[in-house]
Amino acid sequence: MVSWMISRSVVLVFGNLYPAYYSYKAVKTKNVKEYVRWMMYWIVFALFTVVETVADLTIAWFPLYYEIKIAFVIWLLSPYTRGASVIYRKALHPLLSSKEREIDDYIVQAKERSYETMVNFGKQGLTIAATAAVSAAVKGQGAITEKLRSFSMHDLTQIPQDDGYSSYASNPARRAIMDQPDGAEYYHGDDDDRSDEDSKPVFSEDEAVSHHGLRRSQSVKVTRSKLRRDARYGSLKIKGRKRPGINATTYSNMES
């Protein structure tokens, strides 16, 4: 653990910060020699960073691994050894010069393929998003429709029945009319007429003579048949045959 911390500190300070500061001074003073030197160092250090990442995952268990890494970084920076310049001139420059065209072609192809890949991924993402949006809209519309349908059924089946029953129960006149049998309302007016007639006294022929006597200006009331009462059936009216009234003349004729 201590070796790892020391090696990381050396790489960060001597491998990154120190060369970065001297690169700044080379650019500021426009010293071509120093500029070329630090450019070669950054190329070698980029390759070192790639190798270090792989080595930390594979051979970090190797004894003295972190000590070797510290020594290698110091060797690259030392003005006496100039390790970065040696590696660049002996290995990297010849290799990059021979593979430069192939590397350029690979970079161009990678750019084109990456662009096509990004476009395809973008189209697929938009298609998936549109499908998800349409599905969500359809599901939401179906849920809203079912909810409205349930509300409509409730309004049509429950609320009117309750209101009708409550109005029927709370209105005695309406309840009495609805409880009457069919056709009873047509005879309601006849009962009033009959009550007026029934309230008057009805006499037989002998009683009419004995009780009231005979008068020229007044006729004697006699019993009428039940057919005298009007029996209404809708707009039709059936009347019984009227018997002639008894007066003094007709009574004398009947006695003789």
From Swiss-Prot:
The lineage of its organism: Eukaryota, Metazoa, Chordata, Craniata, Vertebrata. PANTHER family: HVA22-LIKE PROTEINS, RECEPTOR EXPRESSION-ENHANCING PROTEIN 3. It comes from Danio rerio (Zebrafish). Keywords: Cell cycle, Cell division, Endoplasmic reticulum, Membrane, Microtubule, Mitosis, Transmembrane, Transmembrane helix. Belongs to the DP1 family. GO terms for molecular function: microtubule binding. GO terms for cellular component: cytoplasmic microtubule; endoplasmic reticulum membrane; endoplasmic reticulum tubular network. Microtubule-binding protein required to ensure proper cell division and nuclear envelope reassembly by sequestering the endoplasmic reticulum away from chromosomes during mitosis. Probably acts by clearing the endoplasmic reticulum membrane from metaphase chromosomes. InterPro entries: TB2_DP1_HVA22. This is Receptor expression-enhancing protein 3. GO terms for biological process: cell division; endoplasmic reticulum tubular network organization; mitotic nuclear membrane reassembly; nuclear envelope organization. Residues 247-256 have a biased composition (Polar residues). It comes from the Eukaryota. The chain crosses the membrane at residues 1-21, 42-62, 68-88. Residues 177-256 are annotated as: Disordered. The gene is reep3. It is found in: Endoplasmic reticulum membrane. Pfam families: TB2_DP1_HVA22. It is a multi-pass membrane protein.
